[in-house]
Swiss-Prot record:
It holds the Pfam family Ribosomal_L27. SUPFAM superfamilies: Ribosomal L27 protein-like. GO terms for biological process: translation. Residues 1-21 are annotated as: Disordered. Belongs to the bacterial ribosomal protein bL27 family. Keywords: Ribonucleoprotein, Ribosomal protein. It comes from Phenylobacterium zucineum (strain HLK1). This is Large ribosomal subunit protein bL27. One of its GO terms (cellular component) is cytosolic large ribosomal subunit.
Length: 91
């Protein structure tokens, strides 16, 4: 009768899945209205022109166009969307 005493229990062994945070559309990339630009905890990036902020601080486009990141004198980085018609006019 080969027996083995039971091993002790461990208090480790739990971990939560990663939250998939970060920049989803980088500077110069095209984005549609409603598209997510940044998923973040807190305000690492702030909403600029044509960008809205959700209750979990997610930044999303309010207009179709190109994403642009701007650091202003207040030391905040703002995500802005240059509307598609303005992008065409600049070219």
């Amino acid at each position: 009768m080969a027996h083995k005493k039971s091993g002790g229990s461990s208090r480790n062994g739990r971990d939560s899945a990663g939250r998939r945070l970060g920049v989803k559309k980088f500077g110069g990339e095209a984005i549609n209205a409603g598209g997510i630009i940044v998923r973040q905890r807190g305000t690492k990036f702030w909403p600029g022109e044509n960008v809205g902020m959700g209750k979990d601080h997610t930044l999303f486009a309010l207009a179709t166009g190109a994403v642009k990141f701007v650091t202003k004198r207040d030391n905040r980085t703002y995500a802005t969307v240059v509307p598609a018609n303005e992008v065409m006019a600049a070219e």
